[in-house]
From Swiss-Prot:
<comment type="similarity">
    <text>Belongs to the DegT/DnrJ/EryC1 family.</text>
</comment>
<dbReference type="InterPro" id="IPR015421">
    <property type="entry name" value="PyrdxlP-dep_Trfase_major"/>
</dbReference>
<dbReference type="Pfam" id="PF01041">
    <property type="entry name" value="DegT_DnrJ_EryC1"/>
</dbReference>
<dbReference type="GO" id="GO:0030170">
    <property type="term" value="F:pyridoxal phosphate binding"/>
</dbReference>
<dbReference type="GO" id="GO:0008483">
    <property type="term" value="F:transaminase activity"/>
</dbReference>
<keyword id="KW-0808">Transferase</keyword>
<dbReference type="InterPro" id="IPR015422">
    <property type="entry name" value="PyrdxlP-dep_Trfase_small"/>
</dbReference>
<comment type="function">
    <text>May be involved in the production of the exopolysaccharide (EPS) component of the extracellular matrix during biofilm formation. EPS is responsible for the adhesion of chains of cells into bundles.</text>
</comment>
<feature type="modified residue" description="N6-(pyridoxal phosphate)lysine">
    <location>
        <position position="190"/>
    </location>
</feature>
<dbReference type="InterPro" id="IPR015424">
    <property type="entry name" value="PyrdxlP-dep_Trfase"/>
</dbReference>
<dbReference type="GO" id="GO:0000271">
    <property type="term" value="P:polysaccharide biosynthetic process"/>
</dbReference>
<protein>
    <recommendedName>
        <fullName>Putative pyridoxal phosphate-dependent aminotransferase EpsN</fullName>
        <ecNumber>2.6.1.-</ecNumber>
    </recommendedName>
</protein>
<keyword id="KW-0663">Pyridoxal phosphate</keyword>
<keyword id="KW-0032">Aminotransferase</keyword>
<keyword id="KW-0270">Exopolysaccharide synthesis</keyword>
<dbReference type="InterPro" id="IPR000653">
    <property type="entry name" value="DegT/StrS_aminotransferase"/>
</dbReference>
Length: 388
């Protein structure tokens, strides 16, 4: 059997060992140290914000943002429905209530139309949310300027979940820098990785300092161990920060490679009937973290996942909308249009293809060959049925 092709595996640069060795030589192996400080500073400079706090995951970063915005039990938080569950889980950590917002077709991300309707209704009912979490899916920025403008009009802060979009640019600004807070993920499948890790960023330096405090068990600066509020064990280790520094050095290369992979897929498959790739919104440049497409040719995403799996190739359906997940039942949901849910339609028809930046042309050729054969077989069956 062929070597397995994964959806988005880690891609080491070769420089990671240098920084790991530095951490061991200096004995800075705890969740603090000079490499943590350097990683925070370099990431903040890279995206153009004043401050950043390195933490154990993107989920932890979202949780800290909610803590900083004083989200409490019973408060509502508006959240994009079309996303991974980690976006909304921290809302439940604080016993708040998620209200889900549909996507729109241009970006597949939060619909400003649905958001505006939700905000208008919440204002009438006196239940404005404590925060809005917008997500940049598969590397593509949401219409962040419109979303932030709407939320500003209602006095609601925005958390930008840029877990999948580090390196993406929208209207000349780096992804993750539009809201009150932005978050990034460095999970093993992301465009750069620290094995597990995340970053909370903001232009509010005092808030980021408070985030570091909360992420360090909220330990107060006393000789003895003193704590006056709930804290968390969320800090990133100095060793993993070293991995992050090495990865950040090759971010531009990783973006270029993922965009090349997308282009190769589109050139090979984009002409086929019923195959439509995730559009790139005109105002942005996506990092194309994952190549995604929708099908309208008689095949389901599960047909493709199964066929590729038979060839030892990993693929997955798009995210299942959170408002349809049992965890959040019953869930309040605002759709983009009266005729139905955009994100539910995308989920039913969409698929993610292998997109790792260390995938070779030959490996991608294998994926394309299997898909072309599968699509051709479907067309032949349709043609045969039509002449009977």
């Amino acid at each position: 059997m062929h070597k397995k092709i994964y959806l988005s595996p880690p891609h080491m640069s070769g420089r990671e060992q240098h920084y790991i060795s530095e951490a061991f030589r200096s004995n800075w192996i705890a969740p603090l140290g000079p490499l943590v400080n350097s990683f925070e500073e370099q990431l903040a400079e890279r995206v153009g914000v004043k401050a950043a706090a390195a933490v154990g995951s993107g989920t932890a970063a979202i949780h800290l943002a909610l803590r900083l915005l004083e989200v409490k039990e019973g408060d509502s938080v508006f959240c994009q429905s079309f996303t991974f569950v980690a976006t909304a889980n921290p809302i439940l950590y604080e016993k708040a209530v998620p209200v889900f917002i549909d996507s729109e077709p241009d970006t597949w991300n939060m619909s400003p139309t649905a958001l505006e309707r939700a905000l208008e209704e919440a204002k009438r009912n006196g239940t404005l949310p404590k925060a809005v979490i917008a997500v940049n899916l598969y590397g593509q920025s949401a219409k962040m300027d419109e979303i932030v403008s709407l939320c500003d009009a209602y006095g609601v802060p925005v958390i930008e979940d840029a877990a999948e979009s580090l390196g993406t640019v929208y209207k000349g600004k780096q992804s993750g820098t539009f809201g009150r807070f932005g978050i990034f993920s460095f999970n093993g499948n992301k465009i750069i990785t620290t094995s597990g890790g995340g970053m909370l960023v903001s232009n509010d330096e005092a808030a980021i300092e408070k985030a570091r405090f909360l992420a360090s068990q909220a330990r107060e600066p006393a000789v003895h161990y003193q704590h006056s509020e709930i804290g968390h064990n969320y800090r990133l280790s100095n060793i993993l920060a070293g991995v992050g520094i090495a990865q950040l050095e090759v971010l531009d290369e990783r973006v270029e490679k993922r965009r090349t992979i997308f282009t190769r897929y589109k050139n090979a498959l984009g002409h086929l009937d019923g195959v439509r790739f995730m559009p790139e919104y005109a105002a942005g440049v996506s990092n194309r973290w994952l190549t995604t497409l929708t099908l309208d040719n008689g095949l389901s995403p599960y047909d493709i996942v199964q066929r590729l799996a038979e060839e030892n190739i990993e693929a997955r359906p798009l995210w299942k909308p959170l408002h349809t997940q049992p965890l959040f039942d019953p869930a309040l949901f605002y759709s983009h249009e009266d005729t139905g849910s955009v994100c539910e339609d995308l989920f039913k028809r969409g698929i993610c293809l292998p997109s790792g930046s260390n995938m070779t042309e030959d490996e991608q050729g294998r994926v394309i060959e299997v898909l072309l054969h599968l699509f051709h077989t479907v067309e032949v069956k349709k043609w045969t049925a039509s002449i009977r």
